[in-house]
Amino acid sequence: MAERGQILVEGFSDQKVVQAILNEHERDLAFDVIYRKGHEGYPSLRESFETTLTKNLDIRGLGVVADADHDVAGRWRSLADVLRGAGYPGVPDTPDPAGLVLESHSSSMAELPRVGVWLMPDNQSAGMLESFITRMVPAGDVLWDLAERSVDECYDIDPRYPAAGSREAHCPKALIHTWLAWQTEPGKPLWQALLKPSLEPGVDHASFRAWLGRLWTVGSAQGT
């Protein structure tokens, strides 16, 4: 069995955050976290996912970490179509709250690896990587309350900020970077912020770590 796996992500920050969580895992999970430099974002990620599944790569597992953005159901359908098109059986119609993992499969087109899909932040909610990080801010943090008020005010007075229809998904990006700018060491990147005691890993962080472990472990997929 191959001793390395791959996780495909949308961009640099996603790569660094996923790698930071892999590094803190109690098990040695040898995943290479990959994105296409110069082609960041979901369309490129989906294309890479589709292409990788046709290559008959000798890898232990292939994971995809994508932002749900404002349409969780639509994003899931897009990735589920890739899985079904590649020949995986039993692809669910809705995302698994714990993150999808399907075992390896021999199709008429390719030898398919164990595969997993995680939609940021929690496979159920609109949002993105930054939404996942914001949920680690301690409850009652006074600077967080101030950041929320400040960002709300910006939305009201400046048309450069997202329109109302996309605020729910994109507001966490403005919030977390505003909050990080006010820390003792201001402006730390998201992946470095994970190492600081000012953040408190919670349920979503634990679920994501568990998903990584299942993606690595033979026989841990749904229905096995």
Please annotate each region the language model reported.
Residues 14-18:
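Short N-terminal binding/cap micro-motifs at the start of the first secondary-structure element
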Residues 2, 21-32, 46-61, 68-224:
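C-terminal accessory helical subdomains adjacent to catalytic cores in phosphodiester-
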Residues 12, 38, 67-69:
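An acidic- and aromatic-residue-enriched active-site/binding cleft used to recognize and process polar
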Residues 13, 40, 124:
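Short alpha-helical
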Residues 34-36:
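RNA-recognition motif
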Residues 7-10:
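Short hydrophobic beta-strand that contains or immediately precedes a catalytic carboxylate
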